């Protein structure tokens, strides 16, 4: 059984409770327990692509367009908001150190803009929680080394996201 320690930081709610209430985010907010359940199920599905470890650690930061734009500018030289950023801790195959195998393996951080997710949910005509799950699953795949430099790999990644969402009871229609 795959174990995951998830650190959820809801900076969107913390920084602007009024905006969160006005936008309807509070009604669509995903609980920490739900996030943990989703990540646990997703990592069970993706187990064959996980490096060996007794457990895994992931950071999830929910934020706004202003913060994600600053992060995007700093790390990707793209001075604009985006929907999701993933910062993988394991960019290369690491040699197996017996001492490291005894500790949780840090996979990286996922940052999601609630503002952008809300816009995209409206465009896709599904709920904000569905869009958050979609974006977070996308970020998780990036943490595990998935990428989409071409159409074929993008389609494979999107198909895997559909599988991940289906595993947590979320049905989504995506046009490839």
UniProtKB/Swiss-Prot annotation:
NCBIfam families, sorted: rRNA maturation RNase YbeY (TIGR00043)
Function, as annotated: Single strand-specific metallo-endoribonuclease involved in late-stage 70S ribosome quality control and in maturation of the 3' terminus of the 16S rRNA.
UniProt keywords, alphabetically: Cytoplasm, Endonuclease, Hydrolase, Metal-binding, Nuclease, Ribosome biogenesis, rRNA processing, Zinc
Protein name per Swiss-Prot or TrEMBL: Endoribonuclease YbeY
InterPro entries, per database record: MetalPrtase_cat_dom_sf_prd, YbeY, YbeY_CS
Essential cofactor(s): Zn(2+)
GO cellular component: cytoplasm
Predominant location category: cytoplasm
Gene Ontology annotations of biological process type: rRNA processing
Pfam families attached to this UniProt entry: YbeY (PF02130)
Signal sequence residues: none
Gene: ybeY
């Amino acid at each position: 059984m795959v174990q995951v320690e998830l650190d959820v930081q809801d900076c969107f709610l913390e920084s602007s409770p009024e905006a969160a209430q006005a936008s309807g985010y509070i009604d669509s907010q995903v609980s920490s327990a739900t996030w943990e359940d989703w990540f646990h199920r997703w990592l069970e599905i993706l187990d064959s692509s996980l490096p060996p470890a007794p457990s895994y650690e992931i950071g999830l930061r929910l934020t706004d367009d202003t913060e994600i734009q600053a992060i995007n500018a700093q790390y990707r030289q793209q001075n604009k908001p985006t929907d999701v950023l993933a910062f993988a801790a394991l960019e290369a195959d690491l040699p197996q150190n017996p001492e490291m195998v005894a500790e949780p393996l840090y996979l990286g951080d996922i940052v999601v803009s609630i503002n952008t997710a809300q816009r995209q949910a409206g465009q896709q005509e599904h709920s904000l929680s569905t869009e958050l799950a979609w974006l977070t699953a996308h970020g998780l795949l990036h943490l595990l080394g998935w990428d989409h430099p071409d159409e074929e790999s993008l389609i494979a990644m999107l198909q895997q996201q559909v599988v991940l969402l289906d595993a947590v009871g979320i049905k989504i229609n995506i046009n490839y």
